[in-house]
């Protein structure tokens, strides 16, 4: 709960010059948040679910009771800089083609998190990433496409995929795409949303000049369920967006996902 409190303090500080609201959607956590947070954070709106409804559905819940022109979806293990929100809003106002923006995420040691900017999981990009080739050629435009390794981490650029850990989106755009696809329980929903935003003709911008701290995995337990959810989401994405491709194309993707899932399961005892 301390992690979430630090997140809320940073958001409140970043909103000092912004007319906005903070909404917390709790997916049936058991850390005492329901009992203690409302009394500590006056003015924050809370939704407490009786069961874990998944990331996508929780985000949609929060968006429905929000009222701003921009909606920020933020993981609870994040800490914002004081100018982060105003800088993002300013970018939107000078880039009318922007549908959503993400930022440069750093871990608690200041290390850049590669998932801050990504490409779509095409067969080649997925193969290079899943089997470690990307790590050998981390700045190749072709081989490192999954993490957009050819784009400098501290520059602003349009990218194919933004991270759901920090995604600010225009309300009008979010409503046009009908929000997050709730078929994605956990993982993959940000890839799906990013793609649907671009299909409407808007751009997803990675803002490398704006940084936040993201305690990657702060609310994640690495176990079989995590592996199953993660690779299940990848298969769902393939089924939804690549169903018009050839059978061989889809078989290749599903085979790669299945092999990587098996390897991840085998590696669990060594994490």
Where are these regions (language model features)?
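Short aromatic/hydrophobic "clamp" motif used to bind/position activated sugar donors
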Residues: 71
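A short, conserved alpha-helix in the catalytic core of glycosyltransferases
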Residues: 152-211
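A conserved acidic beta->alpha catalytic loop
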Residues: 10, 26-35, 51
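Glycine-rich, basic loop-to-helix element that forms the pyrophosphate-binding segment
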Residues: 48-66, 87
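Conserved donor NDP-sugar-binding/catalytic core segment of glycosyltransferases
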Residues: 79-115
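Active-site-adjacent helix/loop segment of glycosyltransferases
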Residues: 192-271
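Short, acidic, metal-binding catalytic loop of nucleotide-sugar glycosyltransferases
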Residues: 9-19
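Short, flexible, basic/aromatic active-site loop/helix in glycosyltransferases
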Residues: 120-159
């Amino acid at each position: 709960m301390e992690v979430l409190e630090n997140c809320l303090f940073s958001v409140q500080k970043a909103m000092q010059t912004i007319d906005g609201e903070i909404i917390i959607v709790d997916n049936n956590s058991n850390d005492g948040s329901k009992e203690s947070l409302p009394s500590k954070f006056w003015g924050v709106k809370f939704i407490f679910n009786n069961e874990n409804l998944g990331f996508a559905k929780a985000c949609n819940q929060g968006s429905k009771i929000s009222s701003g022109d921009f909606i920020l979806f933020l993981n609870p293990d994040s800490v914002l800089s004081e100018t982060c929100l105003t800088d993002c809003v300013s970018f939107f106002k000078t880039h009318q083609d922007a549908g959503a923006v993400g930022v440069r995420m750093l871990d608690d040691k200041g290390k850049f998190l590669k998932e801050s900017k990504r490409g779509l999981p095409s067969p080649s990009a997925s193969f290079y990433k899943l089997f470690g080739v990307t790590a050998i050629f981390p700045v190749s435009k072709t081989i490192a496409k999954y993490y957009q390794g050819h784009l400098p981490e501290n520059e602003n650029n349009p990218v194919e995929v933004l991270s759901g850990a920090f995604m600010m989106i225009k309300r009008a755009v979010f409503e046009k795409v009908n929000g997050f696809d709730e078929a994605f329980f956990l993982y993959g929903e940000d890839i799906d949303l990013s793609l649907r935003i671009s299909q409407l003709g808007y751009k997803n911008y990675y803002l490398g000049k704006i940084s936040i701290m993201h305690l990657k995995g702060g609310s994640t337990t690495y176990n079989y369920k995590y592996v199953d959810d993660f690779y299940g989401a990848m298969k769902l994405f393939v089924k939804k967006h690549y169903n018009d491709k050839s059978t061989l194309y889809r078989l290749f993707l599903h085979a790669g996902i299945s092999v990587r899932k098996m390897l991840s399961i085998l590696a669990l005892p060594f994490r």
